[in-house]
Design a protein with these regions (language model features):
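Short, flexible hinge/linker loops that cap or flank conserved catalytic cores
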Residues: 2-3
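Active-site and donor-binding regions of nucleotide-sugar-utilizing enzymes
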Residues: 6-170
Length: 170
C-alpha cells in the first residue's frame, strides 16, 4: 500500500526537543511518506531535512540576559528564513517542539496560511502567564503534553490536547 505524502515543518531547537522531535518523526514515517523542512539537532537531522542555508541548530541556544540580546539579530534573521522555507515548501503541518516563546511566531504565521499546527511540550500556562491560553487556542490545533494534568487543563478549556508522557518516565 502506498503511503500518503506529508510535508512537515519542524523546529526542535534544544537538545531535549531534538530527541522528542526525532521520535515524532519516526512515528510519522510509519504512517506517511514524510518530507521534512525546518531545524533540529543531530537526532532530527538523522532524517533527511531541508534547512535554510546559514542556519545552525546552535544559533538558537540562548541563556541568561546578555546572550539573547547579542544573538537577537541572528535569531530574527533565522526566523524569517525558516518561515520563508515553510511557506514556499507548502507544508501540511508545523510541529513546534518545546521553545514555545520562539515557536508561537510560526504557529501564528502558518495558521494564517491554513497549515495545521502542533505544539509538543505544553507552555506552562497552568503555572504562569495563563493569558497565553488565548493565543494557544487561536493558533495551535493540538498541544502534546508531557504531564496528564496539562491535558486536563486544556480539556477544561475545550481545547485539543494529547498526553505524550514525559521522556524520563518511559
Amino acid at each position: 500500500m502506498t503511503k500518503k505524502r506529508l510535508k512537515v515543518g519542524i523546529i526542535a531547537a534544544e537538545h531535549s526537543s531534538d530527541r522528542l522531535g526525532a521520535k515524532i518523526i519516526e512515528s510519522l514515517k510509519d504512517i506517511f511518506e514524510v518530507d521534512l523542512y525546518g531545524l533540529g539537532g543531530p537526532e532530527v537531522n538523522a532524517s533527511p531535512i531541508t534547512t535554510p542555508n546559514g542556519i545552525d541548530y546552535h544559533d538558537l541556544h540562548v541563556m541568561g540576559l546578555i546572550d539573547p540580546l547579542i544573538k537577537l539579530p541572528k535569531i530574527f534573521l533565522n526566523r524569517r528564513k525558516l518561515l520563508k522555507l515553510f511557506i514556499s515548501s507548502d507544508i501540511d503541518i508545523f510541529i513546534g517542539v518545546d521553545s514555545p516563546d520562539f515557536n508561537i511566531f510560526f504557529h501564528k504565521k502558518l495558521k494564517l496560511n491554513n497549515v495545521k499546527t502542533i505544539q509538543v511540550v505544553s507552555p506552562s500556562v497552568w503555572g504562569w502567564r495563563e493569558n497565553r491560553i488565548k493565543t494557544i487556542e487561536a493558533y495551535i490545533d493540538l498541544t502534546m503534553c508531557l504531564f496528564k494534568f496539562e491535558c486536563d487543563f486544556y480539556s477544561k478549556k475545550n481545547m485539543q490536547s494529547f498526553f505524550l508522557g514525559h521522556p524520563f518516565s518511559q
